[in-house]
């Protein structure tokens, strides 16, 4: 019947809207992790910056020369590479792609920029976020 068709269409529209709202809520949560990281970095706080990463030995960081496994190893690499706030500079992100892959995974591609006293640096990154204990964290970071 015509009434049934309208009713079905109504539910399709409602469920579509719910999906979009849920996706944007997750995307906002993922972007908030990156913004918190940016602020921590710019405050010279690598420990707080690392809160955005999965605290696990299975965390994967893919750099230009090697793959590093583990949260602690990644933290130590950051601390060795950026010994002080002058070396850290000021970080900025330009998110180019943010895609929800499933209820548990989110994929982000962006450009990072470091403003340093000795000259600026920039590059691209891709991040795989996973929702663990109701919190989005980076489980794979590819920053060559």
Can you name each region flagged by the protein language model?
Residues 73-117:
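Surface-exposed, charged secondary-structure patches
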Residues 17-52:
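Short, low-complexity N-terminal intrinsically disordered segments enriched in polar/charged residues
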Residues 55, 101-102, 132:
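Structural motif
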Residues 54, 65, 97, 110-112, ...:
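A mature extracytoplasmic/lumenal domain signature
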Residues 122-144:
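Short beta-strand edge/turn micro-motifs at domain boundaries
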């Amino acid at each position: 019947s015509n009434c049934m068709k309208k009713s079905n269409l109504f539910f399709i529209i409602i469920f579509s809207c719910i999906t979009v709202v849920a996706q944007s809520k997750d995307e906002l949560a993922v972007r908030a992790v990156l913004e918190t990281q940016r602020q921590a970095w710019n405050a010279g706080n690598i420990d707080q910056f690392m809160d955005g990463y999965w605290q696990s030995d299975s965390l994967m960081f893919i750099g230009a020369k090697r793959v590093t496994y583990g949260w602690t190893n990644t933290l130590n690499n950051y601390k060795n590479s950026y010994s002080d706030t002058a070396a850290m500079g000021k970080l900025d992100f330009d998110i180019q792609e943010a895609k929800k892959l499933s209820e548990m995974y989110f994929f982000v591609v962006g450009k990072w920029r470091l403003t340093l006293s000795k000259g600026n640096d920039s590059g691209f990154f891709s991040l795989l976020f996973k929702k663990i204990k109701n919190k989005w964290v980076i489980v794979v970071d590819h920053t060559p």
